[in-house]
From Swiss-Prot:
Segments crossing the lipid bilayer: none
Any matching Pfam family: PsiB
InterPro entries: Plasmid_inh_PsiB (IPR009385), PsiB-like_sf (IPR038131)
Coiled-coil zones: none
Family note: To PsiB protein of plasmid F.
Keyword Transmembrane listed: no
Name by which UniProt lists this protein: Protein PsiB
Keywords from the named record: Plasmid
Function (record text): Inhibition of the induction of the SOS pathway.
Amino acid sequence: MKTELTLNVLQTMSAQEYEDIRAAGSDERRELTHAVMRELDAPDNWTMNGEYGSEFGGFFPVQVRFTPAHERFHLALCSPGDVSQVWVLVLVNAGGEPFAVVQVQRRFAPEAVSHSLALAASLDAQGYSVSDIIHILMAEGGQA
């Protein structure tokens, strides 16, 4: 019997359990990615894309990228797994630098991620630089 991937289940899964689902195959990984995506709110006019193969490098069982229409940067939410034992929200400039972990979560906290996304969208709309957005998100988000 398959476990339904509810928010509670996502919040209690270990890094190894995320890796086990990834190893189970592409259908299971897609289901896991979609379960995470359902819990998140992308800002208006931003795209939300999940990784299903290795489009974004394939380092994490779940990676969801949020990108504003201008595509100058991405915010990537990465699940626990072999690379990291915690959830991380990373801001990546389109050119690759600056790059920074702007939020770390011991357990999946979609409200904190959605808040950081909304804040980034607001700062971006106000004309803040990518570097300034990184610093503000790091000060605001930190550890959840």
